[in-house]
Amino acid sequence: MFYYKNWERFCESLSKCDVTLCTAEQSLRLPKGERFVVLKHDVETFVANAHRLATIEHKYGICGSYYVQAYLMSDSENIRLLKEMQEWGHEISYHYDVLDAHAGDYEAAEKDFIKYSKVFADNCFTYGTICQHGNPVKKRVGYTSNRDFFRNKEIRSHYPHLVDMVVNY
């Protein structure tokens, strides 16, 4: 069971360590060999819970990376909470699920990827990293996971500015 008081203790301890605490995007610009920690969160249901984690991290000067599923962007309260998190320095990015959503149809998946990326941009969330959503019980034919979307060289070539934290890191 998860307890916020334990997350608070963890963040407090982490803030005292001799290591760079950064977002996933910031980690890409660190000097080679620098020790760092990225707190990466997949936001798949409750933005309010993610906001609570971000509040604790912010208290200790930690900025995490929050990968948000696109459907959550349809709620104005979620957007408000995510914007506040972004103002604190947290990375708010896209937790994509497009290849599974379209049963391996890359063309349809890319259309959704473009559509949902625009939703993030229209709400002033810009990002340089993304992360795929994993669904271990999904039956797939012709592809192995959402990771395959950015493993596809043609699709990858359309987004040279993005780093998939699972595929490219």
List the model feature ranges, each with a label.
Residues G64, I92, Y127:
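Hydrophobic anchor at the start of a short beta-strand
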Residues L99-Y169:
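Catalytic domains of cell-wall/extracellular-matrix polysaccharide-remodeling enzymes
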